[in-house]
């Protein structure tokens, strides 16, 4: 393709067109674009950008361009990218820096060419006003507009896309009375995970062909008034945006939170969800009731399923050691942050060599897998099975120093400073580990969120085991290795099926016992505190009853709760159920007091900084919630909800550090961490934070005159500290003060400080995982049942077959709560103190199981088959709600 520059007339700046030649031959690319601009016949592109002309670009008038491509198949389309409207905010350090990538593509052959607009700094309503000319095949080509937020720290954030077919576009006609105007296109997500909003304002028209102005004018007059951009049926699916969503069912509303995430509000059931509902998904009242009955275990189950599952065969080599830097407790001091000794190559190499020596001496469990053969039988016959068994990890590989958790070792560097090696995770730290660390953090990812186990798929028996049937029909197992028999299935000890065992924490136990002893028993209060409530109005009724108490000490009396229209005496079980139900209401984002945090786990709660816009009496409600939380701790009950770690730190008046940000918002943490480890001067950051409210962006100064203060290497620690204070403390200071006022009316503030933030969470909310081995080990049997009874074998087999949610629901059915105490089922409490989980033989096989939540007892009829027990147990769990005989 060639042109004569000398014949082109002198043009004004507005008439200058930049023509992008074929970059396949010249190897060029548009400035700032990360996609190579290539033009392949029959296509071309021109960008109206006179300020960035380069030597290889050739200037044309409109007539010369059109004459160059005057044929029956191709057309020249003029694309004007005008502006963006109400874009989503993705830049956590300020307003977004959007640009548009315009891609011409063929659904059959792929991308033909791509150009990029300039970047508009710090705007959610950018104005580009850039024009581009493309030579296209109207019936075959499409144009994809992608909006991105330029990010100098990480990859650019996606803000939305518009996919436009070219065949219905109108043709320009200068003789028309009414000129062609812009159109606003809704920005669409790339996938269901994309968070986008706003519009892209575009103007797209064909240039008229030479000698056919009248014909094109007629076509334009016909198309322009009703110009609607439609999807071409045969377009490439990977470049198409999703179809327009169907209307929301009646009673639903679409909203966006302060983080720009779209969620949906059901005003009939007063619930929120992330998934867009459809009319087909609209549930009946009965189905909504079933969902409400299932909701008590939903939080724990969702939290486990949302985590990534690692394969069990993912072995690590000695070289895959991670170096953990010093805790951020000192990042705000005047001294420079120091890394632990493992950051020094000589120490790291020495540790790796030491581990490698041990692996060589005793065998590497990740690579040494001897093959053993064993004959074992079942009722279906015998077979010979080759079992690949891993070499067990030898204790010498996990040395443990005195006073440290298992697998931890204390060492000293060359300067005599002590540091600690965690051989479990292969990390080092300056901080001395404690025994009371959150046990759930030690659980491998591949052991969480297990799918249900099929009754015939518990896996093969261990080597040397055989299954046989007794003369009375009971199944027993023979261990030929030690020549012993037992009734219990050895596969039920498999931790991958039963769930992780919680480590016993004697430190926490001593703290808890001390805490219970120090809680003062009031003598000048009534014997009991009565509450008569309606299930349908449990939040309002509870609020009026509890906030109507002038003297908070009355709330320390024995709780006596009655639900309207239900029979039963409350010996503790109904009170525990009330704590579960009121938790579900108090922490429901529908009411605007709390919101989901910005973690990958979207169900961890934090206080909504804009709660005052949702409820004028929000501070009174936060005091009420504080009182309820204090009542739960005082009476030894549990709340059904987990909060972000800074919430518990604020209760303990502890400093919130950068490390606490990691579990709440990983992107924010990464950006602040980058600032901490690099010189941020070139970013031109200021001591300000952009906050979006009702579609408007507001600037908040982190300190007086912050908009004029540039973040530099000298003041970056102050900047990080102020950002963290604004993110977690300043915005919710009034709400948190009201919550603590209510909580400390029942629990002394000094007494609660004996716990750390992890222990405080477990004190208020209990464990989040159910360990079936621990559950079974601390279960008692009555009235003819025993561990070796056939019905009990079926019962525990049913528990193993349940997924995490079902196990939680069974636990709530029997105990009245979806949580268990910190130290597991050994410290399960009933109405009169410690009360073990108990299974008692009761009734006839035609009865459903029943529960006594006050005494943690399950009345289980002697069913005649496993299937019958499974069906009846499922039915009881699904349909129970305070019926007669269950207290």
Swiss-Prot record:
The record lists the catalysed reaction(s) as: S-ubiquitinyl-[E2 ubiquitin-conjugating enzyme]-L-cysteine + [acceptor protein]-L-lysine = [E2 ubiquitin-conjugating enzyme]-L-cysteine + N(6)-ubiquitinyl-[acceptor protein]-L-lysine
**Principal place of residence:** cytoplasm
UniProt enzyme class: transferase
Region Disordered, as annotated, extends over 297-319, 362-384, 396-440
Listed name of the protein: E3 ubiquitin-protein ligase NEDD4
Task: Show where the C2 domain sits.
Answer: 54-180
Can you cite a GO biological process for this protein?
A: response to denervation involved in regulation of muscle adaptation
Q: Which gene encodes it?
A: Nedd4
